[in-house]
Design a protein with these regions (language model features):
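Perimembrane helix-loop-helix junctions
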Residues: 1-6, 190-223
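Membrane-interface alpha helices of multi-pass inner-membrane proteins
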Residues: 168-185, 191-196, 220, 224
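Aromatic- and kink-enriched transmembrane "portal" helix at the membrane-lumen/periplasm boundary
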Residues: 73, 87, 101, 123-146, ...
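Transmembrane-helix signature of polytopic, membrane-embedded enzymes
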Residues: 105-128, 146-147, 163-168
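Start-transfer (signal-anchor) and selected internal transmembrane alpha helices
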Residues: 1-30, 110, 166-170, 213-220
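Membrane-interface transmembrane helices that cradle and orient dolichyl/undecaprenyl
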Residues: 116, 152-172, 205
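Membrane-lumen/periplasm interface segments of specific transmembrane helices
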Residues: 214-253
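Extracytoplasmic catalytic/substrate-binding loops of multi-pass membrane glycan-assembly enzymes
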Residues: 34-50, 61-78, 84-88, 237-239, ...
């Protein structure tokens, strides 16, 4: 066991194992996988069309309609550049995303467990998530947000344990929140909680000035990717379309009243 533990101390070995696990699980569970003759998931095809359009002179929301965020379309667009006629490129990006997710899961688990059990937890988590009902057919907005979620949880643990102001962590996590807002902005709840917990921690330590400065660093980091997206749509004369579709449409089109019991049942049925 000691030899195995020493072997698992190597970062490259951990990444290689997680990469192999990601390749195999997604090969089976994602319809972007080359094992599937075609991908019949409507959303995935819509994302691919949007991404393809971006790299062929079309502007999202102006020339093509779909209501997810522009960063998701960019990801699918890069997948299109890898393979014009199949979802192979998207599958490869899924593998990279899933490997990064797994690595941060490992780092979180490693805070409390030894190398072997931390890796085991990470591998099992990857397998369970990819095999769950909520995974759908693979390539969802939520799936591509998983590395952002895991990295932010890890950074939060690190910043709390080190009891450090951590300006770089605030900027990084602000930027991560900005990226998530450009994929699916209603997933931002975690980052509001992240920042609120850190803010009130500093307040409890009577670090009032640092508490407010930390919010500024976080918001600056968050603004950077959002500003880049705004600049893109301004240059392409589509800022109003961007706002009308991605913000207004998403805030109004799916408004429905669901009681608490139904929400809880829906949550467990997705597992």
């Amino acid at each position: 066991m000691k030899k195995l533990s020493n072997y698992l101390d190597n970062k490259k070995v951990i990444l290689a194992i997680l990469l192999i696990v990601s390749i195999l699980t997604l090969l089976i569970c994602s319809k972007n996988s080359p094992l599937y003759p075609y991908n019949d998931w409507v959303d995935g095809n819509a994302f691919f069309t949007m991404g393809k359009g971006m790299f062929n002179g079309k502007v999202p929301y102006k020339d093509l309609f779909e209501q997810k965020g522009p960063l998701l379309y960019l990801i699918y667009g890069i997948g299109y550049l890898i393979s014009h006629d199949t979802f192979l490129g998207v599958y490869l990006l899924e593998v990279i995303s899933y490997t990064i997710f797994g690595y941060f899961l490992f780092k979180i688990a490693r805070t409390y467990l030894n190398q072997f059990y931390a890796l085991l937890v990470s591998v099992l988590t990857l397998a369970i998530i990819s095999g769950s009902i909520s995974f759908v057919q693979g390539g969802s907005a939520e799936e591509f947000c998983l590395p952002f979620v895991a990295s932010s949880v890890y950074f939060f643990i690190k910043i709390i344990n080190e009891n450090d102001f951590g300006k770089k962590y605030l900027l990084i996590n602000g930027a991560i929140a900005g990226c998530v807002s450009l994929i699916k902005f209603n997933l931002l709840g975690l980052w509001f909680i992240w920042m609120a917990l850190y803010f009130f921690k500093l307040i409890s330590l009577k670090e009032i000035k640092k508490a407010f400065i930390s919010c500024v660093y976080f918001l600056v980091g968050m603004f950077i990717p959002i500003f880049i997206s705004i600049l893109y749509f301004v240059i392409n004369g589509a800022l109003r379309d961007y706002y009308d579709v991605y913000i207004t449409f998403n805030l109004t089109a799916y408004s429905t009243t669901i009681d608490l019991k139904t929400r809880i049942l829906n949550m467990f049925s997705a597992i």
